From Swiss-Prot:
Its cofactor is Mg(2+). Mg(2+) binds at N193, D207. Succinyl-CoA synthetase functions in the citric acid cycle (TCA), coupling the hydrolysis of succinyl-CoA to the synthesis of either ATP or GTP and thus represents the only step of substrate-level phosphorylation in the TCA. The beta subunit provides nucleotide specificity of the enzyme and binds the substrate succinate, while the binding sites for coenzyme A and phosphate are found in the alpha subunit. Its EC number is 6.2.1.5. This is Succinate--CoA ligase [ADP-forming] subunit beta. Pathway: Carbohydrate metabolism; tricarboxylic acid cycle; succinate from succinyl-CoA (ligase route): step 1/1. The keyword Phosphoprotein does not apply. Pfam families: ATP-grasp_2 (PF08442), Ligase_CoA (PF00549). Keywords: ATP-binding, Ligase, Magnesium, Metal-binding, Nucleotide-binding, Tricarboxylic acid cycle. It catalyses: succinate + ATP + CoA = succinyl-CoA + ADP + phosphate; GTP + succinate + CoA = succinyl-CoA + GDP + phosphate. GO terms for molecular function: ATP binding; magnesium ion binding; succinate-CoA ligase (ADP-forming) activity; succinate-CoA ligase (GDP-forming) activity. Belongs to the succinate/malate CoA ligase beta subunit family. The lineage of its organism: Archaea, Thermoproteota, Thermoprotei, Thermoproteales, Thermoproteaceae. Substrate binds at N260, G317, I318, T319. It comes from Pyrobaculum calidifontis (strain DSM 21063 / JCM 11548 / VA1).
Length: 382
């Protein structure tokens, strides 16, 4: 479960970390009220649980109350990496002396917690990691030993603070709080980027991210409730798929994928990659899917803005090929046709009947998955 920034900052505050003043807003009017209460300048931050929202236009600075109001009208409803902005977090703008990076993850190879710290941070941290990896310090913490003072000293000194200063103590408190959050909330990631030294001399997390292990949510009923009320990182297609009853994951390519069974669907994606294409999604209709489920699955990809081609790969055991074919036919009829190309490979139960149905509507059928995948990639490049 990915927490929104405002939720992550509430956790930081719960563990004694000083955070910048902020208000959650659901409407432009609430943004205006928050800006009036805090006084400009303020920062408007889109609450979507993806990295890189700043570069995508999801963070804006407003120097006047009315500017905050007008900017918020532009930001509400915008799409950032497939997610619609429905909440804005309005925070007080702080003058920053220096930006740093600090995160805590789980290193599964060593079965230990791993702190990553850098005296430089911000939107370009990925580039920094690539070009100057020596600026990032790695500090491992054995969970059976716990976080010790020597761990904290190593991290805080690397961030550039001197022992005995107020900044040292603030940074140390943040390190300790992040570790406690990770342990108490079964977190897979606790991050502040940027962690900032303000011109007033305070060390504060300007941004905060927390990802909680989904398998541990039963231990955190308050988070389960929050997830039910706000699905957060589920796209509109994923939400619709969940409602219908098939498994769907959004990806960034242009070839729509439909398969029956997770293994076959993933193998289909691998074939697309093998021939130089990129899947737009993972969509598993499951075993024994009816024509209604197939119809809705095809409709999802017909409406997908990036999917140029729809590649359907079916092995019919308990899934009947004629039901799949009827589902494709009904989806196309409901849409009034499509300019998207559809490629089908279908083997198994009632295969001949399914072939005949697809032939009626002019959908090509391929003998092998490799041949079909290659054709799908070729069509996507046209």
């Amino acid at each position: 479960m990915k927490l929104h920034e405002y939720e992550a900052k509430e956790l930081f505050a719960k563990y004694g970390v000083k955070i910048p003043p902020g208000r959650l807003a659901l409407t432009p009017e609430e943004v205006r009220k928050a800006a009036e209460e805090m006084g400009p300048p303020v920062v408007l931050k889109a609450q979507v649980v993806v990295a890189g929202r700043g570069k995508a236009g999801g963070i804006k600075v407003a120097k006047r109350v009315e500017e905050a109001y007008e900017l918020s009208k532009q930001m509400f409803g915008m799409n950032i990496k497939g997610l619609t902005v429905r909440k804005l977090y309005v925070t007080k703008y702080l003058e920053v002396e220096r930006e740093m990076y600090l995160s805590l993850i789980i290193d599964r190879a060593t079965r230990r917690f791993l702190f990553l710290a850098s005296p430089v941070g911000g939107m370009d941290i990925e580039e920094i990691a690539k070009t100057t990896p020596e600026k990032i310090k790695r500090v491992y913490v054995d969970p059976f030993v716990g976080l010790r003072d020597y761990h904290v000293r190593s991290i805080v000194s690397w961030l550039g603070f001197s022992p005995g200063t107020a900044q040292w103590q603030q940074a140390a408190s943040i390190v300790q709080a992040m570790y406690k959050i990770a342990v108490d909330y079964d977190a897979e990631l606790v991050e502040s980027n940027p962690l900032a030294l303000t011109k007033e001399g305070d060390v504060v997390p300007l941004d905060a991210r927390v990802i909680v292990d989904d398998n541990a949510l039963f231990r955190h009923p308050e988070l389960e409730k929050a997830l039910e009320e706000d699905p957060r990182d589920i796209t509109e297609f994923e939400a619709y798929a969940k409602k219908i009853g098939f498994h769907y994951v959004e990806l960034d390519g242009d070839i729509g994928i439909i398969g029956n069974g997770a293994g076959l669907t993933m193998a289909t994606m691998d074939l697309v990659y093998h021939f130089g294409g990129r899947p737009a999604n993972f969509l598993d209709i499951g075993g024994g899917a009816s024509r209604e489920v197939v119809r809705e699955a095809v409709k999802v990809l017909l409406n997908h803005p990036r999917a140029k081609v729809i590649f359907i790969n079916i092995f019919g055991g308990i899934t009947r090929a004629d039901e799949v074919a009827y589902g494709v036919k009904e989806a196309l009829q409901a849409a009034g046709g499509t300019t998207k190309k559809i490629v089908v490979r279908m083997k198994g139960t009632n295969e001949e009947l399914g072939r005949a149905i697809l032939a009626e509507i002019g959908v090509p059928l391929f003998e092998s998955a490799e041949e079909a995948a290659k054709k799908a990639v070729e069509l996507a490049k046209l």
